[in-house]
Amino acid sequence: MALWGGRFSQAADQRFKQLNDSLRFDYRLAEQDIVGSVAWSKALVTVNVLTAAEQQQLEQALNGLLAEVQADPQAIVSSDAEDIHSWVEQKLIDQVGDLGKKLHTGRSRNDQVATDLKLWCKQQIGELHQAIVQLQQALVETAEANQDAVMPGYTHLQRAQPVTFAHWCLAYVEMLARDESRLQDTLKRLDVSPLGSGALAGTAYPIDREQLAGWLGFASATRNSLDSVSDRDHVLELLSNASISMVHLSRFAEDLIFFNSGEAAFVDLSDRVTSGSSLMPQKKNPDALELIRGKCGRVQGALTGMMMTLKGLPLAYNKDMQEDKEGLFDALDTWMDCLQMAALVLDGIQVKRPRCKEAAEQGYANSTELADYLVAKGVPFREAHHIVGEAVVEAIRQGKALEALPLTDLQKFSAVIGDDVYPILALQSCLDKRSAKGGVSPQQVASAIAAAKQRLA
């Protein structure tokens, strides 16, 4: 049964109904719609629309409906109801008769759906928070197990300076911390209840909206009814949060795809997160990581689509806003899946320390150490930079590492170079010197791991 039939003398065309109906996706708001209806029934008692006995009867029926929904959410979709609000109301009327028709007094689907969606978003933020923390914990655990795994760090995908696999893991812990912080910021702004705003001008019943907001677990009620029913900033913010985090996850995936490649061979991935080829028997493809990387664009598309949907809408509610849900649901589902998959990838990863160290010793990653050595000997840095560049060219010509060049060859570029240069060029020395906060020295990495464990406990 439609909630708006009295004005019309003809039934809706089936093609329009198919376009218009939203139950196939907004059934996911069933629990929130029922919870909101229970709170609204209590509010109607305070303005003498319902008696206490009527409210108790409605609440009992709604709680029974909630249990039914929780047992089998998908069963809702088989109904021909227009949307989740229509479905809940009709089910209620089926159970309690005409009393069910009183529940919508003073309420519009406009403030109802805005409330439902905010309640759903709050729940999702809690679940996403847990998934982010679990991935951070997996990264910290992997870092702790690989503090001694020296590997090359890259700029421009060229070997730059030595780092450790632990330090690499901790970089993503920091990115995820910002992702989680953005979620909490979004929660603060969306934690205001639109219920009681009516269609656009507010409800005609003197309901205490602050009390109503409290019953629903909101921090407060919205201040303007027009804004209340047309606001979808929280949808944009969550899609933005998801998009930024998916960029981080995509970079994580790309790094590991490269590290797992035959060209780098720094890590082995578990069979649980890889697949084979239908033609080439030797293949072990990093499909889980490639899917994370690929799904990043899908989430970005949801954000762009919602921006374009909202940009030209006049106040207050417009049916265009029904487009807020499918993209949001899909994007947050995708984000959750990718967070969980990234943690699963780490669960079985094996770091190949000898190969990592071998690669770190190649590519003249200790060149900066030689420049710093010259600076310590009184050579201006820019001059030292040039000297080391020339020394690298000579080392390449000879096919040797910098530390393998004889002292006499090094002294051709600067007379201040002495025997004490060789310990400076050692791989471990390169790490040990980076002892400022956030650096790659063993002490700093160990300290960062301890701090992260404390934050995530």
UniProtKB/Swiss-Prot annotation:
GO terms for cellular component: cytosol. It catalyses: 2-(N(omega)-L-arginino)succinate = fumarate + L-arginine. Keywords: Amino-acid biosynthesis, Arginine biosynthesis, Cytoplasm, Lyase. It is found in: Cytoplasm. Its EC number is 4.3.2.1. Pathway: Amino-acid biosynthesis; L-arginine biosynthesis; L-arginine from L-ornithine and carbamoyl phosphate: step 3/3. One of its GO terms (biological process) is arginine biosynthetic process via ornithine. It comes from the Bacteria. One of its GO terms (molecular function) is argininosuccinate lyase activity. Pfam families: ASL_C2 (PF14698), Lyase_1 (PF00206). The keyword Cytoplasm applies. Belongs to the lyase 1 family. Argininosuccinate lyase subfamily. HAMAP family: Arg_succ_lyase (MF_00006). This is Argininosuccinate lyase. It comes from Serratia proteamaculans (strain 568).
